[in-house]
Amino acid sequence: MNESTVYECLKYGNENINRALEVLRAGKMIQIYDSDSREGETDLVIPAKAVTYKDVKWMRKDAGGLICVAVDPVASKQLKLPFMADLVREASRTSESLGEVVEKDGDLKYDSHSSFSIWVNHRDTRTGIPDLERALTIRKIGEITEKSLSGNGIRFGNEFRTPGHVALLRAAEGLLDERMGQTELSVALARMAGITPAMVVCEMLDDESGRALSKENSKDYGKDHGLVFLEGQEILEAYMLWTGSEC
């Protein structure tokens, strides 16, 4: 399917998706809700390359969850980013206690495996935790993701150190054909938008209940702040159009 046909499919398929893609191309924030049958959580989502310290502050104060960067599966391979569970599994060969805590089949109630990779700071940071420093680390993750996809030879360790304060998430190789987490949903949107597929995600939490912010309250927040609210199913349907599976 050529680009113009894909554009027409998306243009007339879902106006909400079209708005979200335009917002992401402008480097701004949107909301993504995965599904009622999965985590049942809404994330604030923004392209990594566009993040400022004010965005980190916004996510930290208004969302309250972990501030993570979801990385495209092709870039993850190029950068040799491991899954955290695999690292712990390897380390458990010499540490029995690690073997007891590493993620096992059936541990997760919402999916088959976690997408967590390593936690990093950029080497130009001091402690890595202030909003300015986390924003720097996040932008640099976006930049190195873009470089890795352009075929440039890159050594991830030249720019980053671990442990750090920004969690990396490895998107599943098959993206939405394989997994419907916020990681894959945000990276799929980045691909559709034609932007670097490194996306910041942060769960929205509820101060009153101590749980994830409900879908309705998340929508209300979005309306108050002018954010596009997307659900996982509509992203999946648009992604199927974009990949040419349906049109």
UniProtKB/Swiss-Prot annotation:
EC number: 4.1.99.12
Catalytic activity annotation: D-ribulose 5-phosphate = (2S)-2-hydroxy-3-oxobutyl phosphate + formate + H(+)
Site residues (Essential for catalytic activity), renumbered to this chain: H165, E203
Cofactor(s) recorded in Swiss-Prot or TrEMBL: Mg(2+); Mn(2+)
Cofactor binding note of this UniProt entry: Binds 2 divalent metal cations per subunit. Magnesium or manganese.
TM regions (residue ranges): none
Keyword annotations of the record: Lyase, Magnesium, Manganese, Metal-binding, Riboflavin biosynthesis
Pathway connected to this protein: Cofactor biosynthesis; riboflavin biosynthesis; 2-hydroxy-3-oxobutyl phosphate from D-ribulose 5-phosphate: step 1/1
Domain of life: Archaea
Amino-acid positions noted as binding D-ribulose 5-phosphate in the UniProt annotation, renumbered to this chain: R38, E39, D43, R179, M180, G181, Q182, T183, E203
Subunit architecture: Homodimer.
Function (record text): Catalyzes the conversion of D-ribulose 5-phosphate to formate and 3,4-dihydroxy-2-butanone 4-phosphate.
Family named by the database record: Belongs to the DHBP synthase family.
Designated name of the protein: 3,4-dihydroxy-2-butanone 4-phosphate synthase
Organism encoding this protein: Methanosarcina acetivorans (strain ATCC 35395 / DSM 2834 / JCM 12185 / C2A)
Lineage of the organism: Archaea, Methanobacteriati, Methanobacteriota, Stenosarchaea group, Methanomicrobia
